[in-house]
Structure formats: C-alpha cells, structure tokens
C-alpha cells in the first residue's frame, strides 16, 4: 500500500461531524488529486517500528494537523510525534485549526501547550 492509500484509509476513520476540512468523504480519485496538488510545508507519515500509524502535516500558514489510526489513539504516539515534529521543524509558532465540537483534538492540543485564541466563521456564497 502506498502513502496515498494509507492516507485514504486514515481519512475514512475520521468522523465527518468533527472534521474541519471535509464535510463528506471524498472518493478515491478526489483524494488522490488532493494529495497530488497540495504542497504542504511538511507532510509526514508517522511510523512506530515498521508500521504506519498516522500522519502529521504543516500547511504554508503554519497550521498543524495530526491523525493517528483510531485503534492506536490514546497510547502516547500522537503526542510524541507532535513534539518531535515541532522540534525538528523549529518554527516559533504553530496553529491548530480545530472544529469546536472535536473535543478530543481540543484536549490533545491543549495538553501539548496550545491555547485557544479565536473562533473563525465562514459563509459560503453559491
């Protein structure tokens, strides 16, 4: 399985109601195009031993995101990956753009020193 397939499998585990970037699950072709065209500052697969367990990324706006396979959440892997990622990257500021109903992510980022700074609203015009 290549990284795009792995990322798609992770995406399918996410809850649509708490995911800020997807309101519905894209199909495989949409996902593949997304992976190909989005050039993040950094986008890494998280490995434990020889197994892929999640991904972590940093956008051009210094927004950080992380997702760990649901079967492996709450074992400390995400926190370790986040701390290593930030240390390796060396930025002075990171943003975590989190859906306000995603309490797990709010708690996770708060535990790692992130503080709430704003609420963002959007309006879509058709």
Where are these regions (language model features)?
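A short beta-loop-alpha structural element at the N-terminal edge
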Residues: 1-9
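Helix-loop element at the rim of GNAT/NAT acetyltransferase active sites that forms part
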Residues: 9-24
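Acetyl-CoA-dependent GNAT
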Residues: 24-71
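Short glycine-aromatic motifs
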Residues: 40-41, 113-115
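Long, contiguous binding/interaction regions
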Residues: 56-59, 85, 97, 108
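Conserved acetyl-CoA-binding loop-helix of GNAT-fold acetyltransferases
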Residues: 74-88, 103-111
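Conserved GNAT acetyl-CoA-binding A-motif
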Residues: 89-101
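Conserved catalytic-core motifs of GNAT/GCN5-like acyltransferases
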Residues: 97-98, 115-126
